[in-house]
């Protein structure tokens, strides 16, 4: 996260407020004093508030949240567009359309129409058979829509945070965000009210250097948070690859073991019919000895019966 110092705030002129006659009494806690009828903002209040806001933006960006940059005043337009595109966030730099958040469904239809016009005007084949007046009307419609909606063309859904330069000038945007419960992070000058601003950053909202400092710090914080996210993704992908490799090796080894066991079993089966058991000499002798007494026992009663028959004669 980018670290903001007191020197940077002083060099950018963040401490210069509006003329004393235009002040808002609700900003009294953030005012240090007055010099030549101009209020001086207390940077000891600005610095911690800005750092807290950057921490909050980092948390939102690390969860893939969207931060909508809003700065339609002339001094902020170019800076808001440049820094928002650098960090890949949506922005509103020309005019805040009523219902841009609260009536987002109709805004989506306008965005769809803008994309259709861009695709149609890119290919010359689509313009065949059209008159010059019809082509000019399409180009004017496209320019009008792109001026208001080019920054939120790829937003996709409602933002998570609204970062506003000059909350007094962009009070319609703040009101819509409050209705929808969207967190508002705003640069509040001495002529504005800090009410309904979730993260108040007291500071100069007119000086170009100050506006650039705010927007650059927010954009750098978002880029840092996204880079950390990408590193974590790469590490997770590497871990998954290593796990997949180890599991694949285990499966291969198991299959090899099963194949070896099957092969061994097949070899045993093939060996059984070829190896017939032949009776050994000892087994044959034991059989003969076991058969001899049986023959003797059978012969004895036969001889006795023969002797009795001879005596009778």
UniProtKB/Swiss-Prot annotation:
Basic residues composition-biased segments: 244-256
Keywords tagged on the record: Ribonucleoprotein, Ribosomal protein
Gene Ontology MF terms: structural constituent of ribosome
Gene3D superfamilies noted in UniProt: Glucose-6-phosphate isomerase like protein, domain 1, Helix hairpin bin
GO biological process: translation
Residues covered by region (Disordered): 234-313
Key word Chaperone present: no
Pfam family, one: Ribosomal_S2
Family annotation (PROSITE patterns): RIBOSOMAL_S2_1 (PS00962)
Keyword Ribosomal protein: yes
GO cellular component: cytosolic small ribosomal subunit
Basic and acidic residues bias locations: 234-243, 266-297
Disulfide feature: none
NCBIfam families attached to this UniProt entry: rpsB_bact
Family (UniProt): Belongs to the universal ribosomal protein uS2 family.
Protein name: Small ribosomal subunit protein uS2
Protein's organism: Coxiella burnetii (strain RSA 493 / Nine Mile phase I)
Organismal lineage: Bacteria, Pseudomonadati, Pseudomonadota, Gammaproteobacteria, Legionellales
Gene name tied to this protein: rpsB
């Amino acid at each position: 996260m980018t670290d903001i110092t007191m020197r940077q705030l002083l060099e950018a002129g963040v401490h210069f407020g509006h003329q004393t006659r235009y002040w808002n009494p609700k900003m009294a806690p953030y005012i240090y004093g007055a010099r030549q009828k101009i209020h001086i903002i207390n940077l000891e209040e600005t610095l911690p508030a800005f750092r807290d806001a950057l921490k909050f933006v980092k948390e939102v960006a690390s969860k893939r949240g969207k931060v909508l940059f809003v700065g339609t005043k002339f001094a902020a337009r170019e800076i808001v567009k440049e820094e928002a595109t650098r960090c890949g966030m949506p922005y509103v730099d020309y005019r805040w359309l009523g219902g841009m958040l609260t009536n987002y469904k109709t805004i989506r239809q306008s965005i769809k129409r803008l994309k259709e016009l861009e695709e149609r005007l890119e290919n010359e084949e689509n313009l065949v058979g059209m008159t010059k007046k019809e082509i000019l009307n399409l180009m004017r419609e496209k320019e009008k829509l792109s001026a208001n909606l080019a920054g939120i063309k790829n937003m996709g859904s409602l933002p998570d945070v609204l970062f506003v330069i000059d909350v007094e000038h962009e009070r319609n945007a703040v009101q819509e965000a409050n209705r929808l419960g969207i967190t508002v992070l705003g640069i509040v000058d001495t002529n504005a009210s800090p009410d309904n601003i979730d993260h108040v950053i007291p500071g100069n909202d007119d000086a170009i250097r100050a506006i650039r400092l705010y927007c650059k710090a927010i954009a750098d914080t978002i880029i840092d948070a996204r880079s950390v996210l990408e590193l974590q993704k790469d590490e997770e992908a590497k871990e998954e690859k290593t796990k997949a490799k180890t599991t694949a090796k285990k499966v291969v080894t198991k299959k090899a073991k099963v194949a070896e066991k099957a092969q061994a079993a097949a070899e045993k089966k093939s060996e059984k019919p070829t190896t017939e058991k032949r009776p050994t000499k000892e087994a044959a002798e034991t059989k003969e000895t076991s058969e001899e007494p049986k023959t003797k026992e059978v012969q004895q009663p036969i001889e006795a019966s023969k002797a009795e028959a001879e005596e009778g004669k």
